[in-house]
Amino acid sequence: MIVVATDAPLDARGLKRLAARAIYALARTGSTYSNGSGDFAIAFSTHTTNRVTAAPGAQQRIVLPTDSVSGLFEAALDATEEAVYNSLLQATDTTSNRQTVRAIPIDELKALLKKYGR
């Protein structure tokens, strides 16, 4: 599960698009997708005009124009990609009753990322 938080004034449509970009970041890290993989993302905004209030009548809302969200999309991609790598690099060797899965060798990962321009 990926959670994307922003203080940008996005409406439901913009937040849905932002969450989708976070999923794209998994592909950057080599993730594969299949039926039942369970990969999903949600996004929310903390912008003050998105808050529900008890004030009577219609509330004015500020929404970032569609043509102004590319920077947010890139930021969601970059932050998600970094979070995946941070998680992988904090892993330790894990042993079950059948096998041991070794932690990723950080130096080898750095070399691979450099080789492929990441």
List where the protein language model places each region:
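A structural signal for small-residue-enriched, beta-sheet-centric alpha/beta enzyme cores
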Residues: 1-118
